[in-house]
Amino acid sequence: MRNTLFGILFLFILPLQAHQKLPYLQKQGSTTQLKVDGKPFLVIGGELGNSSASSIEDIERIFPKLQRMGLNTVLVPAYWDLTEPQEGKFDFTLTDKVIQQARANDLKVVFLWFGAWKNSMSCYAPIWFKEDYKKYPRAYTKAGKSLEIASSFSENVLQADSRAFSQWMKHIASVDKEEGTVIMIQIENEIGMLEDARDYSKEADKLFYAPVPSLFIGYLQKNKRSLHPEMLAKWESQGFKKKGTWQEVFGADVYTDEIFMAWPYAQYVERMAKLARSIYNIPLYVNAE
Protein backbone atom coordinates (compact mmCIF):
# COMPACT_ATOMS: atom_id res chain seq x y z
CA MET A 1 0.00 0.00 0.00
CA ARG A 2 2.82 2.43 0.92
CA ASN A 3 4.53 1.83 -2.44
CA THR A 4 1.23 2.33 -4.25
CA LEU A 5 0.58 5.65 -2.48
CA PHE A 6 4.14 6.78 -3.20
CA GLY A 7 3.68 5.93 -6.87
CA ILE A 8 0.43 7.92 -7.06
CA LEU A 9 2.01 10.92 -5.33
CA PHE A 10 5.02 10.72 -7.64
CA LEU A 11 2.74 10.85 -10.68
CA PHE A 12 1.04 13.98 -9.34
CA ILE A 13 4.27 15.70 -8.29
CA LEU A 14 6.04 15.27 -11.65
CA PRO A 15 3.57 17.43 -13.62
CA LEU A 16 3.63 20.00 -10.82
CA GLN A 17 7.43 20.22 -10.90
CA ALA A 18 7.43 20.51 -14.68
CA HIS A 19 4.91 23.35 -14.45
CA GLN A 20 6.94 25.16 -11.80
CA LYS A 21 9.94 25.27 -14.13
CA LEU A 22 8.12 27.74 -16.34
CA PRO A 23 8.33 31.37 -15.23
CA TYR A 24 5.03 32.98 -14.29
CA LEU A 25 3.50 36.14 -12.86
CA GLN A 26 1.78 36.10 -9.47
CA LYS A 27 -0.36 38.76 -7.86
CA GLN A 28 0.98 40.03 -4.54
CA GLY A 29 -1.57 42.50 -3.19
CA SER A 30 -1.65 45.44 -5.59
CA THR A 31 1.53 44.40 -7.40
CA THR A 32 2.52 41.53 -9.69
CA GLN A 33 5.64 39.48 -9.03
CA LEU A 34 7.76 37.52 -11.49
CA LYS A 35 8.51 33.98 -10.36
CA VAL A 36 11.35 31.94 -11.85
CA ASP A 37 11.87 28.35 -10.68
CA GLY A 38 9.03 28.99 -8.26
CA LYS A 39 10.86 31.85 -6.51
CA PRO A 40 10.63 35.65 -6.75
CA PHE A 41 13.05 36.91 -9.38
CA LEU A 42 14.40 40.45 -9.41
CA VAL A 43 15.49 41.37 -12.92
CA ILE A 44 18.83 43.16 -12.92
CA GLY A 45 18.80 43.68 -16.63
CA GLY A 46 20.45 45.40 -19.53
CA GLU A 47 18.90 45.92 -22.97
CA LEU A 48 20.89 45.49 -26.17
CA GLY A 49 20.75 48.09 -28.92
CA ASN A 50 18.26 47.69 -31.74
CA SER A 51 20.60 45.74 -34.04
CA SER A 52 23.15 44.48 -31.51
CA ALA A 53 21.95 40.87 -31.79
CA SER A 54 21.83 40.72 -35.58
CA SER A 55 24.98 38.61 -35.98
CA ILE A 56 26.57 35.67 -34.20
CA GLU A 57 29.81 37.63 -33.84
CA ASP A 58 28.09 40.49 -32.01
CA ILE A 59 26.26 38.13 -29.66
CA GLU A 60 29.46 36.26 -28.77
CA ARG A 61 31.28 39.54 -28.20
CA ILE A 62 28.65 41.25 -26.06
CA PHE A 63 27.36 38.56 -23.68
CA PRO A 64 30.54 38.03 -21.61
CA LYS A 65 30.61 41.78 -20.97
CA LEU A 66 27.07 41.67 -19.58
CA GLN A 67 28.02 39.07 -17.00
CA ARG A 68 30.99 41.17 -15.89
CA MET A 69 28.62 44.11 -15.39
CA GLY A 70 26.79 42.12 -12.71
CA LEU A 71 23.58 41.62 -14.66
CA ASN A 72 21.37 38.57 -14.29
CA THR A 73 19.14 39.22 -17.32
CA VAL A 74 19.54 40.59 -20.83
CA LEU A 75 16.78 42.02 -23.02
CA VAL A 76 17.48 40.98 -26.60
CA PRO A 77 15.74 41.91 -29.87
CA ALA A 78 14.50 39.09 -32.09
CA TYR A 79 14.04 40.18 -35.68
CA TRP A 80 11.19 39.03 -37.88
CA ASP A 81 13.15 39.79 -41.07
CA LEU A 82 16.05 37.57 -39.99
CA THR A 83 13.77 34.87 -38.55
CA GLU A 84 11.65 34.54 -41.72
CA PRO A 85 13.84 35.91 -44.55
CA GLN A 86 11.73 34.00 -47.07
CA GLU A 87 8.02 33.57 -46.58
CA GLY A 88 7.34 30.33 -44.73
CA LYS A 89 11.06 29.50 -44.28
CA PHE A 90 12.43 30.08 -40.80
CA ASP A 91 15.94 30.54 -39.46
CA PHE A 92 16.43 30.38 -35.68
CA THR A 93 20.23 30.61 -35.70
CA LEU A 94 20.39 33.92 -33.85
CA THR A 95 17.81 32.85 -31.27
CA ASP A 96 19.79 29.69 -30.55
CA LYS A 97 23.02 31.66 -30.23
CA VAL A 98 21.44 34.10 -27.76
CA ILE A 99 20.17 31.25 -25.59
CA GLN A 100 23.52 29.43 -25.79
CA GLN A 101 25.50 32.53 -24.82
CA ALA A 102 23.07 33.39 -22.03
CA ARG A 103 23.53 29.96 -20.50
CA ALA A 104 27.31 30.15 -20.86
CA ASN A 105 27.31 33.47 -19.00
CA ASP A 106 24.68 32.62 -16.37
CA LEU A 107 22.09 35.06 -17.71
CA LYS A 108 18.35 34.92 -18.22
CA VAL A 109 16.81 36.26 -21.43
CA VAL A 110 13.86 38.52 -22.16
CA PHE A 111 13.29 38.55 -25.92
CA LEU A 112 11.78 41.58 -27.66
CA TRP A 113 9.87 40.48 -30.77
CA PHE A 114 10.50 43.09 -33.47
CA GLY A 115 7.63 42.01 -35.69
CA ALA A 116 5.21 44.21 -37.59
CA TRP A 117 6.21 47.24 -35.52
CA LYS A 118 9.31 48.57 -33.87
CA ASN A 119 9.02 52.17 -32.61
CA SER A 120 5.85 52.48 -34.70
CA MET A 121 7.62 51.65 -37.97
CA SER A 122 7.68 48.31 -39.80
CA CYS A 123 11.43 48.48 -40.36
CA TYR A 124 12.13 44.94 -39.08
CA ALA A 125 9.44 43.26 -41.18
CA PRO A 126 10.82 41.00 -43.96
CA ILE A 127 11.43 42.30 -47.47
CA TRP A 128 8.79 40.00 -48.95
CA PHE A 129 6.26 41.54 -46.55
CA LYS A 130 7.28 45.13 -47.33
CA GLU A 131 7.17 44.63 -51.08
CA ASP A 132 3.62 43.26 -51.14
CA TYR A 133 1.88 46.42 -49.94
CA LYS A 134 -1.44 45.35 -51.50
CA LYS A 135 -1.64 42.21 -49.40
CA TYR A 136 -0.02 43.88 -46.39
CA PRO A 137 -1.37 47.45 -46.48
CA ARG A 138 0.14 50.51 -44.82
CA ALA A 139 -1.27 53.21 -42.58
CA TYR A 140 -1.90 56.64 -44.12
CA THR A 141 -1.64 60.22 -42.90
CA LYS A 142 -4.52 62.68 -43.08
CA ALA A 143 -2.86 64.18 -46.17
CA GLY A 144 -2.95 60.78 -47.89
CA LYS A 145 0.72 59.90 -47.47
CA SER A 146 1.52 56.19 -47.21
CA LEU A 147 3.64 55.40 -44.15
CA GLU A 148 6.12 52.61 -43.53
CA ILE A 149 3.75 51.42 -40.82
CA ALA A 150 1.79 48.21 -41.42
CA SER A 151 -1.93 48.65 -40.93
CA SER A 152 -3.20 47.39 -37.58
CA PHE A 153 -6.59 46.89 -39.25
CA SER A 154 -5.30 44.29 -41.73
CA GLU A 155 -6.02 40.64 -41.04
CA ASN A 156 -3.26 39.69 -43.50
CA VAL A 157 -0.70 41.67 -41.51
CA LEU A 158 -1.78 40.00 -38.29
CA GLN A 159 -1.74 36.51 -39.77
CA ALA A 160 1.75 36.92 -41.24
CA ASP A 161 3.19 38.38 -38.04
CA SER A 162 1.41 35.87 -35.83
CA ARG A 163 2.53 32.90 -37.94
CA ALA A 164 6.18 33.87 -37.63
CA PHE A 165 5.85 34.64 -33.93
CA SER A 166 4.15 31.30 -33.29
CA GLN A 167 6.81 29.30 -35.14
CA TRP A 168 9.48 31.15 -33.20
CA MET A 169 7.69 30.44 -29.90
CA LYS A 170 7.45 26.75 -30.79
CA HIS A 171 11.18 26.69 -31.39
CA ILE A 172 11.94 28.38 -28.07
CA ALA A 173 9.72 25.87 -26.29
CA SER A 174 11.51 22.97 -27.99
CA VAL A 175 15.01 24.12 -27.04
CA ASP A 176 14.46 25.89 -23.72
CA LYS A 177 11.52 24.38 -21.86
CA GLU A 178 13.76 22.32 -19.58
CA GLU A 179 16.45 24.96 -18.99
CA GLY A 180 14.15 27.97 -18.65
CA THR A 181 16.68 30.51 -19.92
CA VAL A 182 13.99 32.64 -21.59
CA ILE A 183 11.83 34.09 -18.82
CA MET A 184 9.65 36.65 -20.64
CA ILE A 185 8.84 37.89 -24.12
CA GLN A 186 7.79 41.33 -25.28
CA ILE A 187 5.40 41.37 -28.25
CA GLU A 188 6.29 44.15 -30.73
CA ASN A 189 8.03 47.33 -29.57
CA GLU A 190 6.52 50.75 -28.91
CA ILE A 191 3.52 50.32 -31.15
CA GLY A 192 1.68 53.45 -32.19
CA MET A 193 1.39 56.04 -34.94
CA LEU A 194 3.83 58.67 -36.17
CA GLU A 195 3.13 61.93 -38.05
CA ASP A 196 -0.59 61.70 -37.28
CA ALA A 197 -2.35 60.38 -34.19
CA ARG A 198 -4.41 57.89 -36.15
CA ASP A 199 -4.48 55.95 -39.39
CA TYR A 200 -6.45 57.67 -42.18
CA SER A 201 -6.62 54.71 -44.55
CA LYS A 202 -10.03 53.85 -46.02
CA GLU A 203 -10.45 50.90 -43.66
CA ALA A 204 -9.49 53.00 -40.64
CA ASP A 205 -11.85 55.84 -41.63
CA LYS A 206 -14.70 53.38 -42.07
CA LEU A 207 -14.25 52.10 -38.52
CA PHE A 208 -13.58 55.55 -37.04
CA TYR A 209 -17.00 56.78 -38.14
CA ALA A 210 -18.72 53.55 -37.14
CA PRO A 211 -20.07 52.87 -33.63
CA VAL A 212 -17.53 52.21 -30.90
CA PRO A 213 -17.39 48.39 -30.43
CA SER A 214 -19.73 47.16 -27.70
CA LEU A 215 -16.89 45.09 -26.26
CA PHE A 216 -14.91 48.27 -25.59
CA ILE A 217 -17.91 50.10 -24.11
CA GLY A 218 -18.60 47.07 -21.93
CA TYR A 219 -15.03 47.15 -20.64
CA LEU A 220 -15.35 50.84 -19.75
CA GLN A 221 -18.58 50.20 -17.88
CA LYS A 222 -17.23 47.21 -16.00
CA ASN A 223 -13.99 48.94 -15.02
CA LYS A 224 -15.28 52.48 -14.57
CA ARG A 225 -13.87 52.86 -11.05
CA SER A 226 -10.38 51.77 -12.04
CA LEU A 227 -10.01 53.60 -15.36
CA HIS A 228 -7.09 55.97 -15.82
CA PRO A 229 -8.26 59.45 -14.72
CA GLU A 230 -7.67 60.93 -18.18
CA MET A 231 -9.60 58.11 -19.84
CA LEU A 232 -12.46 58.57 -17.39
CA ALA A 233 -12.48 62.34 -17.99
CA LYS A 234 -12.66 61.86 -21.77
CA TRP A 235 -15.63 59.56 -21.45
CA GLU A 236 -17.30 61.80 -18.85
CA SER A 237 -16.89 64.87 -21.08
CA GLN A 238 -19.45 63.38 -23.46
CA GLY A 239 -21.80 62.21 -20.71
CA PHE A 240 -20.61 58.60 -20.37
CA LYS A 241 -22.36 57.64 -23.59
CA LYS A 242 -22.88 53.94 -24.18
CA LYS A 243 -23.40 54.20 -27.94
CA GLY A 244 -22.13 56.31 -30.79
CA THR A 245 -19.10 56.91 -32.99
CA TRP A 246 -15.69 57.48 -31.48
CA GLN A 247 -16.12 61.25 -31.64
CA GLU A 248 -19.64 61.06 -30.20
CA VAL A 249 -18.48 58.97 -27.25
CA PHE A 250 -15.13 60.66 -26.55
CA GLY A 251 -15.18 64.03 -28.33
CA ALA A 252 -13.50 65.34 -31.47
CA ASP A 253 -9.81 65.82 -30.73
CA VAL A 254 -6.40 64.19 -31.08
CA TYR A 255 -6.86 62.22 -27.86
CA THR A 256 -9.91 60.50 -29.30
CA ASP A 257 -7.79 59.60 -32.32
CA GLU A 258 -5.29 57.96 -29.95
CA ILE A 259 -8.01 56.04 -28.11
CA PHE A 260 -9.35 54.84 -31.45
CA MET A 261 -5.91 53.53 -32.48
CA ALA A 262 -5.26 51.89 -29.11
CA TRP A 263 -8.20 49.55 -29.71
CA PRO A 264 -6.98 47.74 -32.88
CA TYR A 265 -3.42 47.62 -31.55
CA ALA A 266 -4.64 46.02 -28.31
CA GLN A 267 -6.77 43.50 -30.17
CA TYR A 268 -3.89 42.65 -32.50
CA VAL A 269 -1.41 41.99 -29.70
CA GLU A 270 -3.93 40.10 -27.58
CA ARG A 271 -4.65 37.70 -30.43
CA MET A 272 -0.93 37.08 -30.85
CA ALA A 273 -0.54 36.60 -27.11
CA LYS A 274 -3.41 34.11 -26.84
CA LEU A 275 -1.93 31.95 -29.56
CA ALA A 276 1.56 32.21 -28.08
CA ARG A 277 0.33 31.21 -24.61
CA SER A 278 -1.28 28.11 -26.09
CA ILE A 279 2.15 27.15 -27.45
CA TYR A 280 4.44 28.10 -24.57
CA ASN A 281 2.90 29.69 -21.50
CA ILE A 282 5.56 32.07 -20.21
CA PRO A 283 4.97 35.74 -19.31
CA LEU A 284 4.27 38.05 -22.24
CA TYR A 285 4.04 41.81 -22.18
CA VAL A 286 3.81 44.85 -24.43
CA ASN A 287 5.28 48.33 -24.20
CA ALA A 288 3.90 51.40 -25.95
CA GLU A 289 5.02 54.49 -27.82
Segments (PLM) and residue ranges:
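Positively charged n-region of N-terminal signal peptides that target proteins for export
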Residues: 1-4
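Hydrophobic h-region of N-terminal signal peptides that target proteins for export
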Residues: 9-18
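N-terminal carbohydrate-binding accessory modules
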Residues: 18-71
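Solvent-exposed loop/turn segments at secondary-structure junctions
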Residues: 41, 49-53, 79-83, 115-119, ...
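Short, well-ordered coil/turn segments that N-cap beta-strands
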Residues: 42-44, 70-72, 103-109, 174, ...
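A cross-family glycoside hydrolase active-site/sugar-binding cleft signature
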Residues: 44-49, 75-77, 110-114, 186-188, ...
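Aromatic-lined substrate-binding rim segments of carbohydrate-active enzymes
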Residues: 58-133, 269-279
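Polysaccharide-binding and catalytic clefts of secreted carbohydrate-active enzymes
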Residues: 125, 132-289
